[in-house]
Amino acid sequence: MSLHGPYESDNIFAKILRGEMPCVKVFEDNNILSFMDVFPQSEGHTLVIPKAPSRNFLETNPKDIGRLFGSVQRISKAVDLALKPDGIRIAQFNGAPAGQTVFHTHVHIIPCYEGKSLGTHGGGMADMDELNALATKIKEQLEA
């Protein structure tokens, strides 16, 4: 898909927001939802999305951008405390040529560990029990 075009309400994140698809939730408020990536590049790979519909960063309301990145910082700190990675990659893609695969604005929080290579984007599906355990650890730090 190109960088520009109409928002498609049948994307997986829109379905998650409507409750039509499940997710392993990490955080939610009136404007933001965060959940575990089911095709993680590393242990603890978390996604953060605005609830308002937008295809990409360029089309997202500036107020939602502020809320989104405030939440990304807060959740990244919780990931750091919960999982003790050696680094954290914050990634955001716009348009298919840039690597965007779901056309709803989202940010990846990808913990990085010394000596462990990142998996490929969309590689293997994670074990749901493991994702739930990771989400619980992150949520505990958010609530601390």
Regions found by a protein language model. Give the residues of each.
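HIT superfamily nucleotide-processing domains
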Residues: M1-A144
